[in-house]
Amino acid sequence: MNPRPGYRRSARSLEPMGLRSEVNRDVRLATPGEFAVPRIGPLEVWPPVVLAPMAGVTNAPFRTMCREFGAGLYVSEMVTARGLVDGHLKTTRLAHFAPEESPRSIQLYGTEPDSIGRAVDMLVGEGRVDHVDMNFGCPMPKVTRRGGGAAIPLKPRLFEAIVRAAVERSGDVPVTVKFRKGTDDDHLTFLEAGRIAEAVGASAVSLHARTAEQ
C-alpha cells in the first residue's frame, strides 16, 4: 500500500513533507539517525509508534487503513485464549492477519495459565504471529468484578503464572504485557506488575496510566 499522500516513507524513515503539529509547532523535526530504533525482542519498531489494541476497533481493515500513517507496530484487537484453544470460529477470525501485515502482532487475554500457554503454543507453533501482547488492562466492571482484566495484577501469583506461561511457550516470539496503574487509587499494582513481568522474561511492558475506575 502506498504511504499517505504528503509522506515519504522508507524502511527507517517517515518524513513529513511540510506538515507540522499545531500543538508543537515550535518543536523541530527529528533528523535521520537522531533516535535509536526501538526493539521488542528481535523486532525493530520503526517508526516508533504503536497502534494500541482495542476490542472492536483494531481489526484487520482498521489496521490496513492505519498502515497509511506509518506506525511501526499494529496490535490486533483482543483475542481470548480460551476461544482459540476451543476453536471458536469468531475468535479464530480475529487472529487472522492479511499477507502484507508484518509484524503480525496479537493481543491475547485469559485468566488461566494453562489456556494461555496452549494458545501461545498454537499461535507460535503454526507460525501465525511475530509478537504476543498480554492484556491485563480491561476495565469493564463485569470483568474486573470476577477478578479478570485489570484486576488480575491484584493477585501477583496468578499474574506471574499467566505471564510465565506465555513466555515459556513463545519461543523466539517476544511477549509484552499491558496493564493499568491498578483498579483504583487505593489499589495501585503497576510497579509490582512491571517487576514481575520483567523477572519472568517479558520483552517489554506497556502502561495505560489510568486506573480501571478512571
Give residue spans per PLM region.
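Acidic, Ala/Val/Gly-enriched low-complexity intrinsically disordered segments
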Residues: 11, 15, 22-27
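Glycine-rich, positively charged N-terminal anion/phosphate-binding segment
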Residues: 26-39, 54-130
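Structural preference for beta-strand elements that scaffold enzyme active sites
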Residues: 48-50, 73-75, 103-107, 131-133, ...
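Alpha/beta enzyme core
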Residues: 120-148, 152, 156-214
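N-terminal small/glycine-rich loop or linker at the start of catalytic domains
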Residues: 38-50, 82-103, 138-148, 170-178
